[in-house]
């Protein structure tokens, strides 16, 4: 019966593994300069990353970053009352899900209603924030806004 090939029987193909080049071990094999060329800084030691030969480095030429990014900032999707009047001309109760269904906003982001435009119908907005002008226009038309 033939032997089954096993992991410990595997070995690299002939010539696949070369010996590493041992530099600096005599003139016959990469001796003397060890592949670093003649003279100069890079022959003697390594320079730090970002070193430009004495020229003012890029990280010092560029301006410093000012301020900071607030990690708790809330980005609202805005909808104007004119858009509400266009999408819901009959008025009624409007939720974020209704706005998503009509394509006015994307799902998963908070919504804020702004006061650009005119309101003719009474809207009951739920789960949205509203600017002062939007709130006054909606309430003047007989509507209401709740943020919960």
UniProtKB/Swiss-Prot annotation:
GO MF: rRNA binding; structural constituent of ribosome
Family matches, as InterPro entries: Ribosomal_uL15, Ribosomal_uL15/eL18, Ribosomal_uL15/eL18_sf, Ribosomal_uL15_bac-type
One GO BP: translation
Keyword terms: Ribonucleoprotein, Ribosomal protein, RNA-binding, rRNA-binding
Highest taxon above the source species: Bacteria
Pfam families recorded: Ribosomal_L27A
PANTHER family the UniProt entry points to: 50S RIBOSOMAL PROTEIN L15, LARGE RIBOSOMAL SUBUNIT PROTEIN UL15M
Subunit structure: Part of the 50S ribosomal subunit.
Protein name: Large ribosomal subunit protein uL15
Phylogenetic classification of the source organism: Bacteria, Bacillati, Actinomycetota, Actinomycetes, Bifidobacteriales
